[in-house]
């Protein structure tokens, strides 16, 4: 299985509790292996590209009412 890491930059400053909620939202996707943050603006997501895309995962974050972009690695 291939895996891909991506970073999502959230424009808003998000409190730690809200970032934890975002991590949980991303983990609902069966293709997400892990989602974590150690910064109020950044989420690191590891996923299987065979069954989802970075765009789909970005849309999941944006659907939570946040302005977010992908950061290239």
Give the positions of each predicted feature:
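Helix N-cap motif at beta-to-alpha junctions
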Residues: 48-52
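Short amphipathic alpha-helices in soluble, non-transmembrane regions
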Residues: 20-26, 56-64
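A generic structural motif
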Residues: 41-46
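Conserved short beta-strand edge segments in small beta-sheet-based binding/regulatory domains
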Residues: 34-37, 65-73
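Short glycine-/aliphatic-rich beta-strand segments at the starts of folded cytosolic domains
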Residues: 1-12
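Short acidic amphipathic segments
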Residues: 14, 22-38
